[in-house]
């Protein structure tokens, strides 16, 4: 049984990692002028705004629901990968995207015992 402190730390880290996706998805769904401007800057068609907003929101919901959190983390990782490629393509840095991905996975690792079993950070004692 994982410690309560570990799980709560994971929840806080997960929340902090997921938080930037909320206004990002909302602004896309509302077609905020800054999003339109950003898409133009990234040389992407405006027609992609709504589908990206829906995709981002669905990935975020999957991450927030405990039963689908691992799937959500995988989907958000893919979403961030696409965002990184888009930014790298025009010579922009991707530090924020990498940091968000680390936060998402670290939070999930701390709050999800099945993930810690799958990816142990230390060697298991195989005695006995």
Regions found by a protein language model. Give the residues of each.
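Short hydrophobic/aromatic-rich motifs at helix boundaries and adjacent loops
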Residues: 6-10, 30-33, 53-55
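Solvent-exposed, well-ordered loop and adjacent helix/strand elements within mature globular domains
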Residues: 19, 23-48
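Short hydrophobic/aromatic segments of transmembrane alpha-helices and their interfaces
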Residues: 18, 32, 42-43, 52-54, ...
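Core segments of alpha-helical transmembrane spans in multipass integral membrane proteins
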Residues: 23, 44-64, 71
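Extended, low-polarity transmembrane helix blocks
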Residues: 1-24, 64-128
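Generic N-terminal helix/loop capping motif
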Residues: 29, 42, 58-64, 77, ...
């Amino acid at each position: 049984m994982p410690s309560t402190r570990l799980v709560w730390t994971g929840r806080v880290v997960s929340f902090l990692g997921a938080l930037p996706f909320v206004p990002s998805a909302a602004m896309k769904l509302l077609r905020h002028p800054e999003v339109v401007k950003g898409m133009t800057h990234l040389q992407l068609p405006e027609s992609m705004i709504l589908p990206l907003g829906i995709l981002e929101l669905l990935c975020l919901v999957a991450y927030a629901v405990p039963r689908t959190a691992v799937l959500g983390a995988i989907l958000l990782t893919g979403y961030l990968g696409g965002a990184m490629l888009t930014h790298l393509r025009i010579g922009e840095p991707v530090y924020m995207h990498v940091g968000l991905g680390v936060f998402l996975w670290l939070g999930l690792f701390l709050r999800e015992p099945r993930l810690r079993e799958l990816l142990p950070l230390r060697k298991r004692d195989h005695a006995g």
